[in-house]
């Protein structure tokens, strides 16, 4: 192992001890991923499942600039991770993404264009679900990250498309798919949200909003955390973003996308 990777391994281990990098272990447990409605008087009683260990993603080979992987860049990123990682679950995000950071590019003030399917001919679906999804984007947009969202009527012009499904055949209630280039810059994304739990119960207002917040978190590049007070925990029991959700998203967008360690087999 090269000295650079050895130093980072020690650093990441220390960081993991604080922010809970059990994501490797979580991969084996993620079949138990359930997102439930917010705790409290208005809590949902319908479990919202999201069994996939990470958002589905695909790579567009040859897109974008080549990854930045020189020693100086990696040392800088790792130093910033070590100094700023306290109070975040960035270590778990790295573990889930094969030690890489995936995020949307800096857009110079241009918002991400969001299209939400306006009509769904599905039993029990109502238009009241649409503002719940909008609210999820707005809440993340106010989380201190350099992302703005606008809502468009034409799906062809959208960067992100949100659609509805009656229920999934697999035990999930929401799914996020995004594509990234060779540098781990996210290029486009889609979210699918279920109207019914896989057992047939209607996903109520609290459950729909919770899964929307959770999936938009995946959309911007986050993954699961063992912090049960955060919206990105596998079993969501909160109504809003936690300080750790906000801090992790902010740190993610302070750093460049791409691997934070040398890839095995790279000729350096």
Language model regions located:
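A short, polar/charged loop/turn motif at coil->beta-strand junctions and beta-hairpin connectors
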Residues: 106-110, 156, 185-187, 226
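Pocket-edge structural micro-motifs
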Residues: 116-118, 164, 194-195, 234
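Buried hydrophobic packing residues in well-ordered domains
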Residues: 114, 140, 214-217, 232, ...
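Soluble non-cytosolic domains of exported or imported proteins
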Residues: 68, 84, 123-135, 202-211, ...
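Metzincin-family zinc-dependent endopeptidase catalytic domain
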Residues: 127-215, 219
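Metalloprotease/metallohydrolase-associated module, dominated by Zn2+-dependent proteases
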Residues: 2-45, 178-207, 223-268
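Short, solvent-exposed loop/turn elements at domain surfaces
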Residues: 89-91, 95, 121-126, 169-173, ...
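Disordered inhibitory propeptide/activation segment of secreted metzincin zinc metalloprotease zymogens
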Residues: 5-125
């Amino acid at each position: 192992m090269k000295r650079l990777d050895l130093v980072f391994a020690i650093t990441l281990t220390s960081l993991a001890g604080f922010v809970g990098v059990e994501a490797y272990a979580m991969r084996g447990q993620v079949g138990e991923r359930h997102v439930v409605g917010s705790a409290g008087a208005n809590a949902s009683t319908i479990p919202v499942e999201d069994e996939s260990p990470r958002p589905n993603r695909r790579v567009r080979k040859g897109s974008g600039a080549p990854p930045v992987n020189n020693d100086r860049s990696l040392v800088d990123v790792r130093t910033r991770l070590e100094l700023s990682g306290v109070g975040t679950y960035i270590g778990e995000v790295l573990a889930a993404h094969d030690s890489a950071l995936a995020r949307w590019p800096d857009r110079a003030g241009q918002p991400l264009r969001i299209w939400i399917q306006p009509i769904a001919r599905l039993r029990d679906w109502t238009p009241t679900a649409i503002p719940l999804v909008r609210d999820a984007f707005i809440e993340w947009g106010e989380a201190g990250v350099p992302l703005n969202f606008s809502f468009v009527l034409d799906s062809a012009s959208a960067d992100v498309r949100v659609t509805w499904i009656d229920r999934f055949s697999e035990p999930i209630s929401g799914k996020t798919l995004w594509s990234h280039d060779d540098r781990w810059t996210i290029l486009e994304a889609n979210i699918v949200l279920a109207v019914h739990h896989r057992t047939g119960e209607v996903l109520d207002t609290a459950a729909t909003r919770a899964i929307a917040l959770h999936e938009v978190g995946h959309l911007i590049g986050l993954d699961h955390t063992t912090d049960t007070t955060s919206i990105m925990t596998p079993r969501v029991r909160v109504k809003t973003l936690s300080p750790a959700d906000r801090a992790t998203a902010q740190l993610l967008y302070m750093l460049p996308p791409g691997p934070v360690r040398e890839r095995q087999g790279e000729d350096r």
